[in-house]
Amino acid sequence: MGQQPAKSMDVRRIEGGELLLNQLAGRMIPKGTVTWSGKFPTIDHLLDHVQTMEEVNTMQQQGAWPAGAGRRLGLTNPTPHETPQPQWTPEEDQKAREAFRRYQEERPPETTTIAPTSPTPWKLQPGDDPLLENKSLLETHPLYQNPEPAVPVIKTPPLKKKKMPGTFGGILAGLIGLLVSFFLLIKILEILRRLDWWWISLSSPKGKMQCAFQDTGAQISPHYVGSCPWGCPGFLWTYLRLFIIFLLILLVAAGLLYLTDNMSIILGKLQWESVSALFSSISSLLPSDQKSLVALIFGLLLIWMTSSSATQTLVTLTQLATLSALFYKN
């Protein structure tokens, strides 16, 4: 009892090889704390590993592995048979080269490739399909003669355009015309008054510049000649003098134009070219929006009403240039 059958020599050799590999593997795998930080092996572990690997390589080179013991290290065939390498003699190598050269020379030439032709467009004829044999039916069908478009076209009556911009432009042009007429009338009267005052100052001494009609009994405050208010008898005489001065200016201008007809044409052309260039440069700086133009004109008018005489002259010239450029632009 308790006796076991005797193990054969092969079994003992396998068990001995496994014990040897277990001992070698134990020396290869470090145990315990590796270092103080637990990351790197010590020098003793490295030396044990190097010594064990040298012993394993020596045993593998000598073929001393026992049968079946190689599976512990993943070696399925510890002593593989070497594959015999072919040995070529110089004569055999020369013969192989000559045979390959003759093959290249006797090889048939490559055939030239033909470019692929584009496929002919396929078109269905009435005789190709029995459903389309009766061509007259297709030609006489109303849908064949007048095919409907893929997208239906809906015809709508044209909408009448609203004339709001034209109405606004007409009102704006009327306001601008009234404004220009007002400014021109004021400036013409101012120029005529200055000429009248200069005429009176030449014909009357400086001490007698008071109006002679203010002592006729009317309750009028003292004033100078040429500045007669409404109600003074000299008011009509003042505007009569202004009218006479205006007629004289027109007569002088007409005489100059009549005497220098050709010169006036040349001067007119030169002046018109310079004025057109000035107006074109000013119109390029004007805003295109009509509301902005109205705001600009009324802003200049406000400055003109609340400023001195010198500023009024400059603003008036600016307004006239702006309005003229606006008409030139339109």
Curated annotation (Swiss-Prot):
Cleavage (site feature) positions: L240, R241
GO BP terms: membrane fusion involved in viral entry into host cell; symbiont entry into host cell; virion attachment to host cell
Subcellular location per the Swiss-Prot or TrEMBL entry: Virion membrane
Biased composition (Basic and acidic residues): 92-109
Membrane-side (Cytoplasmic) residue stretches: 2-238, 187-238, 314-330
Chain residues carrying a lipid of type N-myristoyl glycine: G2
Chief place of localization: virion
Keywords for this protein: Fusion of virus membrane with host membrane, Glycoprotein, Host-virus interaction, Lipoprotein, Membrane, Myristate, Phosphoprotein, Transmembrane, Transmembrane helix, Viral attachment to host cell, Viral envelope protein, Viral penetration into host cytoplasm, Virion, Virus entry into host cell
Extracellular topological segments: 2-165, 260-292
PTM comment, free text: Myristoylation contributes importantly to DHBV infectivity. It is most likely required for an early step of the life cycle involving the entry or uncoating of virus particles. Phosphorylated on pre-S domain for about 50% of L proteins, the L chains with internal pre-S region (Li-HBsAg).
TM annotation in the entry: 166-186, 239-259, 293-313
Highest taxon of source: Viruses
UniProt note: domains: The large envelope protein is synthesized with the pre-S region at the cytosolic side of the endoplasmic reticulum and, hence will be within the virion after budding. Therefore the pre-S region is not N-glycosylated. Later a post-translational translocation of N-terminal pre-S and TM1 domains occur in about 50% of proteins at the virion surface. These molecules change their topology by an unknown mechanism, resulting in exposure of pre-S region at virion surface.
Name the UniProt record assigns to this protein: Large envelope protein
Species assigned in the record: Duck hepatitis B virus (isolate brown Shanghai duck S5) (DHBV)
Organism lineage string: Viruses, Riboviria, Pararnavirae, Artverviricota, Revtraviricetes
Originating gene: S
